UniProtKB/Swiss-Prot annotation:
Gene3D superfamilies in alphabetical order: Acetylglutamate kinase-like
Chain positions recorded as UMP binding sites: G59, D79, L140, G141, N142, P143, F144, F145, T146, T147
Organism field: Buchnera aphidicola subsp. Baizongia pistaciae (strain Bp)
Pfam families: AA_kinase (PF00696)
Name of this chain's protein: Uridylate kinase
EC number: 2.7.4.22
NCBIfam families recorded: pyrH_bact
Family, per entry: Belongs to the UMP kinase family.
Source domain of life: Bacteria
UniProt KW keywords: ATP-binding, Cytoplasm, Kinase, Nucleotide-binding, Pyrimidine biosynthesis, Transferase
Purpose of the protein: Catalyzes the reversible phosphorylation of UMP to UDP.
Chief location bin: cytoplasm
Binding site for ATP: K17, L18, S19, G20, G60, R64, T167, Y173, D176
A biological process from GO: 'de novo' CTP biosynthetic process
Amino acid sequence: MIFSNNKKLKFKRVIIKLSGEALQGVHKFGIDIIELNRIAKEIKAIFDLGVQIGIVIGGGNIFRGKKLAKFGINKVISDYVGMLSTIMNGLLLCDSMDLVHLSSCLMSSICIDKICEQYSFKKALSLLRRNKVVVFSGGLGNPFFTTDSAACLRAIEMRADIVLKGTKVNGVYSSDPKKSSNSILYKNISYNEVLQKELKVMDLAAFALARDHKLPICIFNINKPNALYYIVTGQKEGTLIR
């Protein structure tokens, strides 16, 4: 699809929450390079419109801390292993973006100076202003916090207009669409309605952070072609929470 670069932007600075599972493609584990490259092109399309982009990346395609904890491994240790998985994903995403001539910087909450930069609020903000894509890895650098919390905190710190959470479904539903044919897809919903209806959007700590700072969240299907383009240009896509 050929995009128009003259489209008026609804959101000029965004934080994309990209789950590890989004990078799996058709696989049950690891990374689907074809899917990774497709996502990089989707990111490039909105970058070319003039959108400033930060990406918080997950690591569930490689490792989930919760799984080891179930087998008796210390939760702190298993969470740190999960954080390392996000750095691996971040490295590959940056390389994929480089292939489409998209300049990026991988930052991490965990210090691994050979392969990524230590997260710095001022440096990250400066990079965004200079039109570099910033990939935030390592979660928050502390156990017991999810990458959803990292996405919301980084969005607040970077003064982003919105968090775009890419999932495998088209948005927020009234019930599980796989279990109920009567499930309704919400196009717009408030923070309070999400809490009252006990809808699964993200973990409560992350969601409360977004609500308290009046940070809009859009839940959308990352596997749907052109979804990012539609969102930043103000077209109806996914579920907008505000």
